[in-house]
Amino acid sequence: MTSQFVPHRPHPALRGLVTGALGYRQEGLPPGTHRGLPSPALTLVVTLDGSLDVAAHPDRAQAPGRYDALLGGLHTTPALIRHPGRQTGLQLALSPLGARRLLGVPAGELAALDVDLADVLGGTELVDRVREAASWPARFAAAEDVLRRVAGHGTPPAEVAEAWRLTLAGGGRLRVAEIARRVGWSERHLTARFRAETGLGPKEAARVVRFDRARRALAARPRPDLAALAAAAGYADQAHLTREWRAFTGLSPLRWLAAEFGFVQDGGDRDAAGSAA
């Protein structure tokens, strides 16, 4: 098996709109299913070796589909993506607060949906240019050039933007009541406006932010200590972490780690009291 992951710092002109970028190439894998997990960003994927075969979308009512380029909204359940043993493509993380400028619609209109990128951008220029480029730097530059040109001037309400900032900065730990107090809105009004703009309610967003941070921390540890991870991420206990992990991935933390990376060196750690991975 060969794997290549190429991180890229987004162009300064896209600051606040594109929060991350990655090129990836994996070959020699056994055919299987990749889980597209919830995160605090919309996901833009351009494939370079065929199409993306989505067997199940976050909204299970959406029919399976194949995409040359896909845009996924914020969600709380995993997408299931079949692959034939190889995966090559470019992935961008888009801030939900930048959706109006980049896509012409609020991220709330894309909640739990996967859509063909061409349907949102109004054409295939981004996909065509990325696929024509011969190197990772050229591919990133091509995608960013198109996004810089299509970016408009729409912005979310300042109160929603501040609520999102507080959710990220607090790692999902701030209560909705406290966020509402800080932005000067009632909880009910904040929840409605926040969901319309991002696709998630404030409580859901906090859960996703907390999970995303825990996922990154777990992926970086060859010998995971789930109890310590739960405490650091703001979960009540290890059992709480495991429940949330199952809700977002369909697997326990250690089973997810084994499925994603092929091995787990857990030194006897268990997913939750009385429950092996």
Range-by-range predicted roles:
Residues 194, 206, 244-246, 257:
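DNA major-groove recognition helix of helix-turn-helix
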